[in-house]
C-alpha cells in the first residue's frame, strides 16, 4: 500500500492571493485532504475565490477560529468543512464529558447563501438564513488539548505545552478523512472528496446512524447571542458534533 504523506505548504505572506495560491498548489499535489488553520473575516469577496476549492477528489477543512462568535473565510465556503472545537474532560477510567469550547468560532454568514446540504431535515438545523458554520467539531480547548514539544529559539531546552484551538481540531478531522480515503480505496470506492453531502444527507438525517457516528454536543456557550449556546442536533458552535470515529469511518 502507498504510505501516507503529510505535506506542509507555507504561503510567502498572509495576503489573499498568496493563500489562494497555496490552496491551488495543494490541488496540484492532490488528491487528498487540505487542513487550513488560517482565517480572515468574511466579506462580499469570499464567493469570488471559491473556485480554489474545486480540486478533483479533494477534501477541504478549515478552522472556525478561536475568538468566540465569528464567521471567517475559508471556513465559510460551502465547499469547506468548517471545524469547531470542544472542551474534553476525561479520566483514567474511560469516562468523559464534552461541551462546546467557549473560544470556538461559528455563526451565520452575512454573504454566503445556504448550501443545499444544510436543510431542515438535519436535526436542529431549522431553516437557516444563510451558510452556517461550523459543520463539525473536535477537542480544541488548550486546557484539554494535545501535549506538544516546543523549543524556544536560541534554547536547547525542550518543553511540553498543552496546545489547542480549532487549529488542533481541524487537522484531527483531516486525519479522519485521510483514514476514510484509505478505507474507501481498499473497498474499490472513489475518494471521499467534499464530505458535506454524506455527513449531512446520509448520516445526520438518519436518526440511528447519526446517534452512532456522532456525539451530539448539547451544552456550552461561545457568546451571548440567541444561537450562541450548544443544543440538541446541529448548532453553530459544534455543528453536527464530534465524531465517534470507529462508527463514522464505516459509514463514510
Feature names for model-found ranges:
Residues 1-252:
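Subtilisin-like serine protease catalytic core
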Amino acid at each position: 500500500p502507498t504510505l501516507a504523506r503529510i505535506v506542509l505548504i507555507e504561503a510567502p505572506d498572509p495576503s489573499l492571493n498568496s493563500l489562494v495560491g497555496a490552496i491551488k498548489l495543494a490541488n496540484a499535489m492532490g488528491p487528498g485532504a487540505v487542513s487550513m488553520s488560517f482565517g480572515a473575516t468574511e466579506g462580499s469577496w469570499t464567493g469570488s475565490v471559491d473556485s480554489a476549492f474545486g480540486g478533483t477528489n479533494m477534501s477541504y477543512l478549515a478552522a472556525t477560529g478561536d475568538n468566540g462568535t465569528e464567521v471567517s473565510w475559508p471556513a465559510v465556503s460551502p465547499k469547506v468543512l468548517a471545524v469547531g472545537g470542544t472542551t474534553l474532560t476525561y479520566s483514567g477510567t474511560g469516562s468523559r464529558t464534552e461541551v462546546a469550547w467557549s473560544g470556538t468560532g461559528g455563526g451565520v454568514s452575512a454573504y454566503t447563501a445556504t448550501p443545499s446540504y444544510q436543510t431542515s431535515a438535519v436535526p436542529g438545523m431549522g431553516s437557516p438564513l444563510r451558510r452556517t458554520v461550523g459543520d463539525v467539531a473536535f477537542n480544541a480547548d488548550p486546557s484539554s488539548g494535545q501535549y506538544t514539544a516546543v523549543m524556544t529559539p536560541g534554547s536547547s531546552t525542550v518543553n511540553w505545552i498543552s496546545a489547542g484551538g480549532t487549529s488542533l481540531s481541524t487537522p484531527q478531522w483531516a486525519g479522519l478523512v485521510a483514514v476514510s480515503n484509505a478505507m474507501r480505496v481498499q473497498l474499490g470506492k472513489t475518494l471521499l472528496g467534499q464530505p458535506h453531502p454524506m455527513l449531512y444527507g446520509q448520516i445526520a438525517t438518519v436518526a440511528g446512524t447519526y446517534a452512532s457516528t456522532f456525539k451530539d454536543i448539547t451544552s456550552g456557550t461561545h457568546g451571548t447571542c440567541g444561537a450562541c449556546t450548544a443544543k440538541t442536533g446541529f448548532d453553530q458552535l459544534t455543528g453536527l458534533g464530534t465524531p465517534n470515529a470507529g462508527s463514522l469511518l464505516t459509514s463514510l
